[in-house]
Amino acid sequence: MYFPYVRGRQYELLALRELATNNLLGDYVTPIIEPVKLSPTLVNVMAEFIKVKHPISIIRNPAVGTFMSDWQDVQEQSKEAGYKQRFSAQYEDSTIIKSLIMQRNAKSLLEFWDKHGVNKADLLVINTDRDYLDLYESAFGTVVPRYALMPDESLFRRKVRHHKVLLDDKFEKQDRNADYQETEDEFFSDDHLYYTEDGFIGFSDYSVVGNEYLEAGFAPYAVAIHIVYFAEDKTLRVRH
């Protein structure tokens, strides 16, 4: 199983909607969205995936962006109130995989879901902070989540033992787009070849965007296009 991890920027959401609409996502691909904003595009993407019955993970407590503050600051009778209502209704559909990041607000979210009858066995959980592994063990000691994303590190391997999904940032991001000229072609990943041998049920990455999230954009002096392709040895390489 492949879990492409995106941050829910406008262009990423539009790309996902296009892929879903045109049935271009295989059964083995489950996108993960960490929404950075409560927007009509986000709820439209959810609606499209529900329509075509393709599973998608939506993180309810994103660590970046303004989604959480957008949610809390919604005013009654506003257009944002409509987005919030649609999001909440669609989030209950079985196509949407309820997901959370193990961080400061994870405990309260788990308690909220428990009160509302959400089964922990249906959740996708993201473990990237070792400080919250004890909370993970406490919350999922008797119930194993559907998917547990984690880096390939010894402490995480000891603490997260079941339904493990490898999460890694494979993209070697440069400071400037022009710098990619110095390395026009390079290795990207071989996780798809070995993840089962390493004890994982799936793998996840941030594609050619990378894990780094910047709140504000800027106009670059150069434009870089990144193309991921299969090499002869079945590994993935990226050409800039």
Enumerate the predicted regions with their spans.
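A broadly used, surface-exposed interaction patch
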Residues: 47-120
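A short, Lys/Arg-enriched amphipathic alpha-helix followed by its capping loop at the start of a domain
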Residues: 19-27, 49
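Active-site-adjacent beta->alpha loops and helix N-cap segments on the catalytic face
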Residues: 40-43, 106-113, 132-138
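Extended alpha-solenoid helical-repeat scaffolds
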Residues: 80-87, 99-101, 127-128, 133-137, ...
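Conserved, mostly hydrophobic/aromatic
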Residues: 16, 31
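Catalytic beta/alpha-barrel core
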Residues: 4-8, 33, 55-62, 96-106, ...
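Long, charge-rich C-terminal accessory regions
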Residues: 135-240
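N-terminal, charge-rich interaction modules
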Residues: 2-8, 23-26, 36-38, 179-190
